[in-house]
Design a protein with these regions (language model features):
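Conserved AMP-binding/adenylate-forming core of the ANL superfamily
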Residues: 7-8, 12, 17, 25-56, ...
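Conserved AMP-binding/adenylate-forming
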Residues: 34, 50-93, 184, 371, ...
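Conserved AMP-binding A3 loop
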Residues: 37-39, 136-137, 141-171
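Conserved AMP-binding/adenylation subdomain of ANL enzymes
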Residues: 167-178, 186-226
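Gly/Ser/Thr-rich phosphate-binding loop
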Residues: 226-228, 242-298
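AMP-binding/adenylate-forming catalytic core of the ANL superfamily
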Residues: 227, 283, 322, 345-435, ...
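Conserved ATP/PPi-binding loop(s) of AMP-dependent carboxylate-activating enzymes
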Residues: 312-339, 370-372
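Flexible lysine-rich "adenylation lid" loop at the C-terminal edge of ANL adenylation domains
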Residues: 431, 443-462
Length: 462
């Protein structure tokens, strides 16, 4: 039995607690190839609640949880919600930036779940949260969640969300699926995946690490039906040929989002996994994950759902309004206008009820007044021989304002002169002249972040 704060329907996420209890012996989690039932998970949640009370962690305080999708982390996250805490998951943040994150979120306690079901809790600050948004959650007795942006385009922003509002969309019962959790637990996509699975009685499957072989090995061994991933990782999956080394017959759906999907990558996935449905997702920490419907498995056009969400297009840019939007940033002004609309900064094409994501406004390259979308150029360059990955960005130029630069990760060693020549020849007749990379470089390190998103500089002269 999960003895949460308040046993009536006013308790936070009471419906989720009741649902977890009803799943009983169903497998909730696969961790290190061991299945853990919902009953065992509920017992772990109860122990974590006892730990929070023993260590005098009061409702309304802020708790940082260090770790990924271990049973202890999942149990503590649930316990924190039921105990009316504001949670700050930390899994992918570099150590150098963690102190600033803890200070920004006014974290009082840091928790370190261990492999044996225990948890060490460290006091960081005995003062209750002072930020007005954090105080508002405490006054309402609502659990909260703080998620930090990657900071790829500047200072990392801290979004504060109301967990009751965020999880409300999962109350409608649906069939559960065996799902590999790939997106990090400190990312909105990871949180969305985790609670989508638990709320519907599905099974969370973890891989030993986030490499193509480890992911495919886990999917084959545990009959995974759903894989949410990023286009960057799916391209790595194709390059590695891991999909052909494992039995993935149970796989039914791959969802992808967080960055534009190259059409060439989508087509290649369709070829190697013809029985798998490919679905594009869309969401942002600030507004949550929208319900979407892809036009087809081989299409980059998608329809944005309207249940709890509204959207409009202003000057080619997507704006959203959401019932589950964040309360605000803890370290930046509110990005919402007076009517609650949020500018996503994503440029889109529109075709009837469908939209196609072109890329961020900050990443567009302005070459002598002509717009270049990095994703379009990358899609073509990925089709070149000996190319594992490529990132396109803008570089300042005194004549045109900017030129296109391409940074390649190669499959086999090749000298830069040869690569520059091949790039020009390959683009001839396939790209307009102003879109052809003028700067061609070879990357020595990975071009993606710990969250498997492309590291991309803002487009010069955008």
């Amino acid at each position: 039995m999960i003895d949460a704060e308040g046993e009536d329907e006013a308790a936070p996420c009471h419906w989720l607690r009741d649902r977890l209890l009803q799943w009983g012996r169903r497998p909730a989690l696969v961790w290190h190839d061991e299945e853990i039932s919902y009953a065992a998970l509920c017992d772990a949640v109860s122990r974590m609640l006892d730990t929070l009370r023993r260590d005098r962690v009061p409702p309304g305080s802020t708790l940082a949880i260090f770790g990924d999708y271990s049973p202890g982390v999942c149990a503590l996250l649930l316990a924190a919600i039921f105990h009316r805490l504001t949670v700050v998951p930390i899994a992918s943040a570099p150590r150098a930036g963690q102190q600033e994150m803890l200070a920004t979120a006014e974290v009082m306690f840091a928790a370190y779940p261990d492999a044996d079901g225990g948890c060490r809790i460290k006091i960081l600050d005995e003062r209750m949260p002072r930020h007005a948004l954090l105080c508002s959650l405490g006054e309402r007795g609502a659990p909260g969640l703080v998620l930090f942006s990657s900071g790829s385009t500047g200072r990392s922003k801290a979004s504060l969300l109301d967990m009751d509002d965020l999880l409300a969309k999962f109350r409608e019962e649906r069939p559960g699926q065996r799902t590999l959790v790939f997106l990090m637990i400190d990312h909105i996509g990871g949180i969305n995946t985790l609670f989508h699975v638990l709320a519907h009685g599905g099974t969370i499957v973890t891989a030993r690490d986030r490499t193509p072989d480890a992911v495919c090995e886990a999917m084959a061994a545990h009959r995974v039906e759903l894989l949410p991933a990023t286009p960057t990782f799916l391209n790595m999956l194709l390059i590695s040929d891991a999909v052909n080394r494992y039995d993935l017959n149970a796989l039914r759906i791959i969802t992808y989002g967080t960055e534009p999907m190259p059409a060439s990558t989508l087509a290649a996935l369709r070829t190697v996994l013809p029985a798998v449905r490919l679905k594009q997702t869309y969401g942002l920490t600030e507004v949550g994950i929208l319900p979407t419907r892809s036009q087809s498995s081989d299409s980059l056009w998608l329809r944005l759902g309207e249940r709890g969400y509204e959207h409009r297009i202003v000057d080619g840019v997507l704006w959203l309004r959401s019932r589950s939007a964040m309360l605000g940033y803890l370290n930046a002004p509110s990005p919402f206008d007076a009517e609650g609309w949020f500018n996503t900064q994503d440029l889109v094409q529109v075709d009837g009820d469908y939209v196609r994501i072109l890329g961020r406004t900050s990443e567009v390259i302005n070459v002598g007044g002509e717009k270049v979308y990095p994703a379009e150029v990358e899609d073509l360059l990925l089709q070149m021989d000996n190319v594992e990955d490529v990132t396109v960005s803008g570089r300042p130029n005194p004549v045109t304002g900017a030129v296109v630069a391409a940074r390649f990760t190669l499959t086999r060693p090749e000298d830069a002169t040869s690569l520059r020549r091949r790039t020009r020849e390959f683009c001839q007749g396939r790209l307009e002249r102003f879109k052809v990379p003028v700067v061609v470089e070879i990357a020595e390190d990975a071009q993606h972040s710990a969250r498997f998103k492309k590291r991309r500089a803002a487009g010069a002269g955008a």
